[in-house]
Amino acid sequence: MSILSFLLGEKKKSASVAKERLQIILAHERTGHSAPADYLPALQRELVAVISKYVKISDQDLRVSLERQDNLEVLEVKIEIPQN
């Protein structure tokens, strides 16, 4: 980070904001404070909003799921991008 960007401030990129949010969600989930289904719909809506800035997609084009196998958790995001 340069001194100029430090003094003037720098706007965070949407990718870094999304990464921070996912890290918070996963950390919260690992502590056992909420059921996984609680945040998945909100996460899906936010992802659609961010991706829609760059590619035209609908709510049905994006699917978010969380699977648990033993002590492994997998957050899966599937996005169907139109051919046009």
UniProtKB/Swiss-Prot annotation:
Gene3D superfamilies for this protein: Cell division topological specificity factor MinE
InterPro entries registered for this protein in UniProt: MinE, MinE_sf
GO biological process terms, semicolon-separated: cell division; regulation of division septum assembly
Keywords per UniProt: Cell cycle, Cell division
Superkingdom of the organism of origin: Bacteria
The keyword Cell cycle appears for this protein: yes
Family, per entry: Belongs to the MinE family.
Function: Prevents the cell division inhibition by proteins MinC and MinD at internal division sites while permitting inhibition at polar sites. This ensures cell division at the proper site by restricting the formation of a division septum at the midpoint of the long axis of the cell.
Name this protein carries in UniProt: Cell division topological specificity factor
Organism: Cupriavidus pinatubonensis (strain JMP 134 / LMG 1197)
Source taxonomy: Bacteria, Pseudomonadati, Pseudomonadota, Betaproteobacteria, Burkholderiales
Gene name linked to the record: minE
